[in-house]
């Protein structure tokens, strides 16, 4: 069993939620030291959660906001003991993008490659 080097917190928005997500996020962010690596990962650029998190960046300039969340991205971020450099973060994002694969197309191409080899 591998434990994550960094703590992971999840915030969710519900239709009947009375507390804005920015209030909950601020409460969490206030618990971090200035030198802590903090990554906020959201699902969709331009979505309501991403837009709300964008409003926090002027108050928390050390926070990295990344949209387009997938498991590969979150696991890579959480498994690092130290803050990533900008280049390392860019590589992490590129690797996460590469994990988005149309498996049907992958199988179709593999079958076609086998036919071509005959």
Please report, for each region that a protein language model flagged, where it lies by residue.
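Short acidic DE-rich linear segments
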Residues: 111-118
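Short beta->alpha junction loops
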Residues: 10-19
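N-terminal small/polar loop signature for handling phosphorylated ligands or for N-terminal nucleophile
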Residues: 23-35
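Short, glycine-/small-residue-rich phosphate/pyrophosphate-handling segment
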Residues: 80-106
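Short, small-residue-biased leader/transition segments that mark boundaries at the very start
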Residues: 2-6
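Short coil/turn segments at beta-strand junctions that form active-site/ligand-binding loops
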Residues: 35-37, 61-62
């Amino acid at each position: 069993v591998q434990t994550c080097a960094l703590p992971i917190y999840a915030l969710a928005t519900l239709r009947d939620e009375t507390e804005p997500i920015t209030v909950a996020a601020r409460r969490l962010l206030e618990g971090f030291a200035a030198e802590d690596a903090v990554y906020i990962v959201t699902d969709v650029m331009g979505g309501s959660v991403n837009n709300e998190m964008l409003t926090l960046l002027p108050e928390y300039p050390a926070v990295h906001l990344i949209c387009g969340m997938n498991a590969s991205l979150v696991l890579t971020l959480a498994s690092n003991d130290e803050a990533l450099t900008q280049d390392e973060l860019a590589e992490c994002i590129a690797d996460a993008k590469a994990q988005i694969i149309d498996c049907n197309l992958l199988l179709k191409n593999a079958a076609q490659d086998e036919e071509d080899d005959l």
